[in-house]
Amino acid sequence: MTILIQQYTNDENKKLELNNISKLLQNRIILFSQTVDDEICNSIVGQLLYLENEDSTKDIRLFINSPGGSVTAGLSVYDTIQNLSVDVSTICFGLAASMGAVLLAAGVENKRFAFASSRIMIHQPLSKVEAPWSHLDIQIRNGAYFKNLLNNILSFHTKQELKQIETDTERDFFLSATEAKQYGIIDHIFINNN
């Protein structure tokens, strides 16, 4: 997890990258721009906790461009956002799909944004079952648990009826920024200033 500015390195490009990330953190901005997995989510959770500890009165801005990924890893970020004493504003640039869309919706109400050309996609969780036949029922119940949990999370944050969420997440459900605002995933759209 990169939080502090690296002072010495043999690679000038790496030093510049670390300094840019540190500059963002100094401005209370976290960049989530990859697949949701344990490594990135551990880093994001660490950055959220670090920024809350630095100043518990200022908002944190979480910029999201993610195709989604691990549900359990994403839920660690979700739970952290929900339990911080500071407001987390979420901003979609590019794509917020699957778990990325759940994290986008998890921002504080009236502080969830998307850029005008962003795409948001929700669906039911994917499952890759690798278990003996005798354990398949356990895996199926676990998958159903996460499907129900994510649908309830989306229903809570969007104010959509649970039945509507269940219907919409049966397949990939893509939304433009405008549609995501109408749906309740975001509250505001950044319009291009041309």
UniProtKB/Swiss-Prot annotation:
Keywords: Cyanelle, Hydrolase, Plastid, Protease, Serine protease. Its main location: plastid. It catalyses: Hydrolysis of proteins to small peptides in the presence of ATP and magnesium. alpha-casein is the usual test substrate. In the absence of ATP, only oligopeptides shorter than five residues are hydrolyzed (such as succinyl-Leu-Tyr-|-NHMec, and Leu-Tyr-Leu-|-Tyr-Trp, in which cleavage of the -Tyr-|-Leu- and -Tyr-|-Trp bonds also occurs). It is found in: Plastid, Cyanelle. The active site is at 98 (nucleophile), 123. HAMAP family: ClpP. Component of the chloroplastic Clp protease core complex. PANTHER family: ATP-DEPENDENT CLP PROTEASE PROTEOLYTIC SUBUNIT (PTHR10381), ATP-DEPENDENT CLP PROTEASE PROTEOLYTIC SUBUNIT, MITOCHONDRIAL (PTHR10381:SF11). This is ATP-dependent Clp protease proteolytic subunit. It comes from Cyanophora paradoxa. The gene is clpP-A.
